[in-house]
Design a protein with these regions (language model features):
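Coil residues (strongly favoring Ser/Thr
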Residues: 26-27, 32-33, 41, 53-56, ...
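A beta-strand signature from Gram-negative outer-membrane beta-barrel systems
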Residues: 125-171
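Transmembrane beta-barrel wall of Gram-negative outer-membrane proteins
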Residues: 180-204, 210-244, 273-282
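Exposed, low-structure sequence patches enriched in small/polar residues
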Residues: 119, 170, 278-309, 327-643
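Flexible loop and strand-edge segments within Gram-negative outer membrane beta-barrel domains
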Residues: 232-288, 305-330, 382, 442
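Extracytoplasmic beta-strand/coil segments of soluble accessory domains associated
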Residues: 29-46, 71-113
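Short strand-turn segments of transmembrane beta-barrel domains in outer membranes
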Residues: 158-187, 207
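Periplasmic plug
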Residues: 46-54, 93-140
Length: 643
């Protein structure tokens, strides 16, 4: 009843404005109407892309079928698998095309590395409403940009609008089990040279099972000072506070008694953690007035993470054990990049990047174990000072593109050297149709990452041993209106042993006036991954009511055959793979209805239509379950305001 009341109030509040939107001046095909105007003439219009030739996704890729976080957004795209650990949990995004057992992607935000420093990144620190674009760096070239990056990099490009008027955006989502999510985004222009961006979000969840509630607050602000067309300053402040109960999954992981949550007994009823994450960054961009082909980009950042983990704290029985840990990590970083843009002619250009990273990372971990009258405590302090130099070259001539790069780093006393090269050639048939051939290879020399999964572990890793490995891929893309097709083959070699030799990824689709379809099929030869993943999204779209409603409705399907997903340990934040894990398959079908009218996007999702019991982590089922009566999983609205 409470959820229905909130929905009615929202619709009542918004409906007069919806009906009042009679102008066709707005582009209804644009899902996010807050766009940058010519007002910001002093801004250096160089984005936060790590590489100007990267593939990017924008809000149109996730606003229509109502994705709640970064993991759900990427799970729709080829190449990604998520290990779900409950609503608001530390869900991990894996690179399905990686040859490494440690396959978690590396996350950057506006060009700054966030993951791999404190060994994990909680995706709940990011709001969907703050994301403008998502940059994907290829597996071939990703390691050139960050410390210990052995898989694909995802770079979140946050919204950075600069408009001559006060503007705001509200995103509200309502989910099952009293899950409510709201996020506000504001733009305050103070002058043609100064503006302030502000965001505030809250996410609350009562939980489908015992001890599964969570509460999350996010706050972010950004101050832009455009001193001149040659010098820009940007200051970011982000803070996230997350409290969540940790039930460690369900005991009856393969039983269908989840139709009634009463019979779904959780592993733990007295376990929780509290997380505080603070991020500060000062960005300086400089283009010398006399040298427009140069761009200097400097970031001074600090990340402060504190976690409290509590087991047995509320249990008053004398013969029960208790375990408390605190983890505190601070990352001070200096990043400097120098870009050289050389345009030889209209069809020939060269871009060169030279950069350096230096970080100082103190970490403190304390723990207390109590059983009866015995108390065991420990304190661990450590410090890391990784340093790296790197460079990348991009060259384009007509339809041929070439890229190469090298990175040397010292981390924890280990020296690593990485290099890569990739190229592509596009044969254009006409303005819209083409055939593209691409290939790439990279090499790691004396890499300091153990082959086995330790990225999300807080415990000491095994001592690394020097070795050489490489990753190479080749593929072809075809676009012939209205269809497109892509086929990619890739191999992974470690010390001469091919352990990922027969993997491939293919995607295809069609785009017509009223119907679109996207399909992908990928294989893996690694035992801890499914043999293959099939994904599809088929939808109908049209402009209705005299072009005032941009309407879309479709089906979203995912299937993975029987496999043994990993177990998750919330104490050490570790994923482990075992032959004893239950073997399951995954099948999910969602139906969604969405539309944009005036300044608002509205979406409804009917989730898991076949009521399938799905897992991507061995004992954590997806919460989108409950039969036909509970099929309407989510409602969301994204509303733009202009004052």
């Amino acid at each position: 009843l409470n959820k229905l009341t909130i929905l009615v109030v929202l619709l009542f509040f918004f409906s007069p404005h919806l009906l009042a939107q009679r102008s066709t001046k707005d582009s209804l095909r644009v899902a996010d109407s807050i766009k940058t105007a010519d007002y910001d003439i002093f801004r250096i219009k160089k984005s936060y892309l790590l590489n100007i030739t990267s593939d990017t996704s924008d809000i149109n890729d996730w606003i229509w079928n109502d994705k709640r976080n970064l993991a759900e957004i990427l799970f729709e795209k080829p190449g990604y698998l998520i290990n779900y650990t409950g609503y608001g949990g530390l869900t991990v995004i894996s690179d399905f095309q990686s040859g490494y057992l440690n396959s978690g992607i590396s996350i950057f935000k506006d060009g700054i590395q966030l993951s791999n420093f404190n060994s994990f990144t909680d995706i709940e620190n990011f709001s969907v409403n703050e994301i403008s674009e998502i940059e994907e760096i290829s597996e071939i070239s990703s390691p050139v940009y960050g410390y210990s990056v052995n898989n694909k990099i995802i770079n979140i490009i946050s919204k950075d609008n600069y408009l001559p008027y006060l503007s705001a955006q509200l995103r509200y989502t309502q989910d099952r089990n009293d899950a409510l999510y709201g996020d506000f985004y504001f733009n305050f222009p103070l002058s043609r040279k100064v503006n302030v961006l502000f965001g505030l979000g809250n996410n609350g969840y009562e939980g489908a099972y015992q001890n599964s509630d969570m509460s999350l607050w996010r706050f972010r602000t950004r101050v832009n000072w455009y001193v001149s067309k040659s010098l820009n300053f940007k200051f970011d402040f982000n803070y996230a506070k997350l409290e969540r109960s940790l039930n460690d999954g369900l005991n009856n992981s393969t039983s269908d008694t989840l139709l009634d949550p009463i019979f779904a007994r959780v592993v733990s009823t007295d376990l929780y953690d509290k997380n505080n994450n603070l991020f500060l960054n000062l960005n300086i961009k400089l283009i010398p007035p006399s040298l427009k082909t140069l761009l200097t980009d400097i970031n001074l950042s600090a990340q402060n993470y504190f976690r409290e983990y509590r087991f047995g704290e509320k249990n008053l029985l004398p013969d029960t054990s208790k375990y408390f840990t605190n983890l505190h990590t601070i990352v001070y970083s200096f990043d400097a990049r120098q870009y050289f843009f050389i345009d030889k002619s209209k069809n020939a250009n060269i871009n060169i990047l030279v950069g350096t990273n230096f970080s100082f990372i103190p970490q403190n971990k304390s723990s207390v174990y109590i059983y009866k009258n015995n108390v065991i405590s420990s304190v661990e302090n450590s410090t890391r000072e990784p340093f790296a130099l790197y460079s990348r070259l991009n060259a384009g001539f007509n339809n041929f593109n070439f890229s190469a790069g090298i990175r040397g780093e010292n981390s924890g006393g280990n020296n690593n050297l990485f290099s890569f090269a990739e190229a592509d050639y596009t044969a254009r048939l006409n303005e819209s149709d083409f055939i593209k051939f691409y290939s790439g290879i990279n090499y790691y020399f004396y890499r300091n990452i153990p082959q086995y999964a330790v990225e999300y572990s807080l415990v000491n890793s095994p001592a690394p041993t020097p070795y050489v490995d490489c990753y190479f891929s080749k593929g072809i893309s075809l676009s012939y209106n209205p269809v497109y097709f892509d086929l990619k083959l890739y191999n992974y070699i470690t010390d001469g042993d091919i352990n990922f030799a027969k993997a491939f990824s293919t995607s295809a689709g069609f785009r017509t006036k009223y119907f679109n379809g996207n399909f992908s099929f990928e294989t893996s030869s690694l035992s801890f991954m499914p043999d293959y993943i099939f994904k599809s999204d088929i939808y109908y779209h049209n402009l209705l009511f005299d072009n005032h409603l941009d309407f879309r409705t479709g089906f979203n399907i995912k299937y993975m055959p029987k496999w043994k997903p990993p177990s998750y340990n919330s104490a050490t934040l570790t994923f482990s793979y075992s032959e004893s894990n239950p073997e399951i398959d995954y099948f999910n079908m969602d139906f969604y209805v969405a539309g944009r009218i005036g300044k608002a996007n509205v979406a409804f999702t009917f989730a898991n239509l076949f009521n399938k019991l799905n897992y991507t982590t061995s004992i954590f089922p997806f919460d989108n379950r409950g039969g036909l009566a509970n099929a309407l999983a989510r409602f969301s609205i994204t509303w733009d305001f202009k004052y």
